[in-house]
């Protein structure tokens, strides 16, 4: 248990590391995997962040051990306990993780600028940044771009609002 706490402390220290500090090694890794200019490279770095690991760890620690013991007494295997009991109870945590991951990936500007080197594929924040480049700025078009860029995030948050709130607070039903 002490080793797990040390590992978690190292993980929490990784949360303090700015993305710019790990951007070049990440780019080299994705280049060696031949994932530059792919949508996989955009999503892959957002999935396993230290925050997500901490969120799921805390939610798993709050899972009642009495339920697990009762399931073992009923004869369920560890896999059955995981799929029949753990995952359904953790739906709110999964909802919160999906919301945060989508918001981070959708609103990210720096990583797509680095990893998408072809002008054929750009993200919405990159498109909005392109709208304001030049000598004259059409603010109406720029605000429309910002609104369109914001809509998917707002819709997903509103749809998963209850799951997001329960998952962040660690509510277990």
Predicted regions span which residues?
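A structural signal for multi-pass alpha-helical bundles of membrane permease subunits
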Residues: 1-173
């Amino acid at each position: 248990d002490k080793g797990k706490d040390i590992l978690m402390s190292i993980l929490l220290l990784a949360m303090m590391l700015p993305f710019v500090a790990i951007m070049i090694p990440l780019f080299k890794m994705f280049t060696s995997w031949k994932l530059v200019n792919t949508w996989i490279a955009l999503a892959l770095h957002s999935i396993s962040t230290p925050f997500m690991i901490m969120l799921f760890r805390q939610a798993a620690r709050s899972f009642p051990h009495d339920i697990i013991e009762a399931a073992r007494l009923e004869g369920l295997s560890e896999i059955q306990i995981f799929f029949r009991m753990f995952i359904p109870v953790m739906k709110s945590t999964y909802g919160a993780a999906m919301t945060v991951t989508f918001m981070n990936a959708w609103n990210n500007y720096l990583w797509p600028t680095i990893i998408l080197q072809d002008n054929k594929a750009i993200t919405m924040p990159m498109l909005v940044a392109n709208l304001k480049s030049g000598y004259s700025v059409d603010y109406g078009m720029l605000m429309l771009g910002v609104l369109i860029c914001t809509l998917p995030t707002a819709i997903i948050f509103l749809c998963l609002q209850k799951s997001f709130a329960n998952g962040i607070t660690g509510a277990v039903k």
